[in-house]
A protein has these predicted regions:
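C-terminal helix-rich "cap/oligomerization" subdomain common to oxidoreductases
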Residues: 1-3, 68-71, 282-317
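Contiguous beta-strand/loop segments that form the cofactor/metal-binding neighborhood of enzyme cores
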Residues: 177-250, 275-288
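Predominantly a Rossmann-like dinucleotide-binding segment in NAD(P)-dependent oxidoreductases
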Residues: 125-194, 199
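Rossmann-fold dehydrogenase core element
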Residues: 107-124, 140-146
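Beta-loop-alpha module in the N-terminal Rossmann-like domain of NAD(P)-dependent dehydrogenases
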Residues: 21, 51-109
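Active-site loop of classical SDR/Rossmann-like NAD(P)-dependent oxidoreductases
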Residues: 39, 267-279, 293
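N-terminal Rossmann-like dinucleotide-binding module
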Residues: 1-50, 180
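Hydrophobic residues in well-ordered beta-strands that form the structural core
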Residues: 57, 94, 119-121, 145-146, ...
């Protein structure tokens, strides 16, 4: 069998998350990290020197030199940057949420289809090792409960705290929305949502109850004002209950048996979700496969997040 071909990759945006994209790509045997681009040219030059690559002066220069690129810029720039890359025939992995609006998300999906390029979206939790076990053992979930809690981001001079350019639904909860839509695989029939701003200008804590067409109910809480971090999901099926911890990559499975309830430890091979995500993206480019989290999947999660936000602010329609 021939060796996988080397993919020429660039990273656009080398802030808190993009720096890790650059680190991981620089260590991948199947990747040539061609270069980085960031509006902060000094930052790009610093990271480029660290990883033995170059800093490009413009986005267009980077786009003309690569086959694939990661986009890790503020959400309001996702559409502009990803569009520029797609129009030059570059395969794109854009961070979540896919875009700032559903219209922008749908436009990116359309552009990628027309240009015949891969559009993957960085819902990194889909690559958490616990997800494989969850997908295998949570067929036909009946009730789902998810909690995603984080401390408020530290201040940045002259900038919003990281992530607070959007509300907590688009910042944190959207991870769980995308996973739950994937697990249930049915349309949402009803949404009931509440949320309040506490430390920022938009909702910092939110709760939503989703009712799906098949009767499954999901209750989801997200907060970025918690003193501690938590990323957990509990899934109840007809004959089992799974409690999974994304953060610690651990979990428990409880099954009904003829003697009562049997408890099992969840066998999970731990790994770095971001590295697994980038490896999957590179394989998709090599093989021209459909990504695990496509633009269409991410746009569906964004539509639901937008409806949740609308309802928090205006009430049920």
């Amino acid at each position: 069998m021939s060796e996988p071909r080397i993919i020429r990759v660039g990273v656009v945006g080398v802030g808190a998350l993009g720096q890790h994209h650059a680190r991981i790509y620089s260590q991948m045997e199947s990747v040539q990290l061609v270069g980085l681009y960031d509006a902060d040219r000094a930052r790009a030059a610093e990271l480029a020197a660290k990883h033995g690559t170059r800093a490009f002066d413009t986005l267009e220069q980077l786009a003309d030199a690569v086959e694939a690129a990661n986009v890790a810029v503020p959400t309001h720039l996702h559409h502009e940057v990803a569009s520029a890359l797609i129009q030059r025939g570059v395969h794109v992995l854009v961070e979540k949420p896919i875009a700032a609006t559903t219209q922008e998300a749908e436009d990116l999906v359309r552009q990628a289809q027309e240009k015949g390029v891969i559009l993957q979206v960085g819902h990194v939790e889909r690559f958490n090792p616990v997800l494989g076990f969850l997908e295998e053992h949570a067929a036909k979930p009946r009730f789902i409960e998810a909690h995603r809690l984080a401390p408020f981001p530290p201040p940045r001079e002259g900038l919003h705290p990281r992530g607070t350019e959007v509300n907590v639904v688009l910042d944190l909860m959207i991870h769980d929305l995308e996973i739950i839509l994937h697990l249930v695989g049915e349309p949402v029939r009803d949404v009931r949502a509440v949320g309040v701003p506490v430390l920022s200008g938009s909702e910092d804590i939110a709760n939503v109850r989703l009712l799906f067409e098949n009767g499954c109910v999901a209750n989801i809480t997200a907060s970025r004002i918690s003193p501690e971090r938590m990323r957990k999901i509990r899934v109840f099926t007809e004959d089992a209950y799974l409690s999974l911890d994304y953060q610690n990559q651990a979990g428990e499975l409880f099954r009904k048996s003829h003697t009562g309830i049997a408890r099992e430890e969840v066998p999970i091979e731990k790994g770095e979700p971001l590295a697994l995500e980038l490896q999957s993206f590179v394989r998709c480019v090599q093989r021209r496969d459909r990504p695990v989290v496509s633009g269409e999947h991410a746009a569906e999660a964004l539509r639901l997040a937008v409806e949740i936000t609308r309802q928090m602010r205006q009430g049920p329609s």
